[in-house]
Amino acid sequence: MISSLAAITGGPSTFRRDPDSNTLRLSRRKTLISVLRSCKNIAHVPSIHAKIIRTFHDQDAFVVFELIRVCSTLDSVDYAYDVFSYVSNPNVYLYTAMIDGFVSSGRSADGVSLYHRMIHNSVLPDNYVITSVLKACDLKVCREIHAQVLKLGFGSSRSVGLKMMEIYGKSGELVNAKKMFDEMPDRDHVAATVMINCYSECGFIKEALELFQDVKIKDTVCWTAMIDGLVRNKEMNKALELFREMQMENVSANEFTAVCVLSACSDLGALELGRWVHSFVENQRMELSNFVGNALINMYSRCGDINEARRVFRVMRDKDVISYNTMISGLAMHGASVEAINEFRDMVNRGFRPNQVTLVALLNACSHGGLLDIGLEVFNSMKRVFNVEPQIEHYGCIVDLLGRVGRLEEAYRFIENIPIEPDHIMLGTLLSACKIHGNMELGEKIAKRLFESENPDSGTYVLLSNLYASSGKWKESTEIRESMRDSGIEKEPGCSTIEVDNQIHEFLVGDIAHPHKEAIYQRLQELNRILRFKENQIDIIMGF
């Protein structure tokens, strides 16, 4: 397209003289940039581009910069690259615009390649282009650019330093990230937030909290980063405590904060707090985006309120694949298997392409509903219809489905014939089904395989012990328990949580660590006496 336009207007502008005055050129430049910025559709760009060429602005760095930016923003990065390629001797700003375009379009390799070409063409980089290319870098390229940064004297650039810290943190190079942080002259809340993320990425949540406490002025992003770090490191109670502290400090939360807190609520089953966050989102007039909506559906589903999950799903305007995946998973969790299948059909009819997560959710729905024929049909159509290669989770769903309907031998043959090695979860699922359906012989065979294949966990011992016990083989059941004890394997203690006044309290079996343990155990004894009294009253009434 560009070459044809150039032919119409007489070839590259490098060889043409613009007869207009500088004043007129500046006026046209301003107009063209304004028109480009107002462009909302790529279909309108070619006519504007033609005018740019006719008015000799196709080599004007200011106009070309805006043209590249607009094309990239409108998802036409190839058009943007054609524009860039037509420029004689592009400067560092045009390289920056084009690299940004590649990176924002997910073409990181092209962005890095163009940066290397810029260096090869002796165009001196600045901190802006370095920051842009760092967004596309892996650890290896980051180290190369870090060496260039030091050589070219950009080591003190704040934006470059923050971006390199982020890459080092995500790559597990915590020492390098900390070194860059320590060398920064201005370690304000922004730099601290990046370092908090680095600590969280690497699992050093204690260090992240210590740094967070040292930050004097914390903004919303800093609070959210710390809450997110706690959630990602499974410190859900601490995440909720920090959110409450954030509210007491009158720091405004945003949708990212809300999603982090909703994730913690989902994990802990904190329905009331989740409802409060939902009302907070509505009161703050936050948009019910996919990001927030999907988190709400997940929270309500996992906290037991599937009706509210349905309502949120219905009112969401722009659903995506994740929305459907979350809703289908929630329905499966609550035994609404037929409804889950209907949502899947609606998803496909609306043009959404199912992915691996979708099909795991759908197979789980079939499993929970005992829908064997539909489940097998879905599994057999994964590769053929949806071009999704079955993974171990999908095979595990079929084993669970066959086990639930009592077809244990068929499930075992299925495991024997799958192209991947079954894990302890898949084998444990079938062992559990053997206990339910009383198939001692197959249960022993699976247990033997579990003991031989890897270090068995407490669940394997407990399942086999219970299988023997349910069949009246008390001696064998006791021997398995003793073997478990002799191997030094301990069963994880039972755990329960209750939510009181938006606070989560966790209790373990035989727990004596709670600060109010004396009052708790006293109350439990009182409740036990009341229950025994009520039981005696019922016995008297029934005549026992």
UniProtKB/Swiss-Prot annotation:
Residues 1-21 are annotated as: Disordered. Residues 502-532 are annotated as: Type E(+) motif. Residues 1-25 form a transit peptide. It is found in: Plastid, Chloroplast. GO terms for biological process: chloroplast RNA modification; chloroplast RNA processing; mRNA processing. Residues 426-501 are annotated as: Type E motif. PPR repeats lie at residues 60-90, 91-125, 127-156, 157-187, 188-218, 219-253, 254-288, 289-319, 320-354, 355-385, 391-421. InterPro entries: E_motif, Pentatricopeptide_rpt, PPR_At4g14850-like_plant, TPR-like_helical_dom_sf. PROSITE patterns: PPR. Disruption phenotype: No visible phenotype under normal growth conditions. Gene3D superfamilies: Tetratricopeptide repeat domain. Keywords: Chloroplast, mRNA processing, Plastid, Repeat, Transit peptide. GO terms for cellular component: chloroplast. One of its GO terms (molecular function) is RNA binding. It holds the Pfam family PPR_2. The keyword Cytoplasm does not apply. Belongs to the PPR family. PCMP-E subfamily. Involved in RNA editing event in chloroplasts. Required for the editing of a single site in rpl23 transcript. This is Putative pentatricopeptide repeat-containing protein At5g59200, chloroplastic. It comes from Arabidopsis thaliana (Mouse-ear cress).
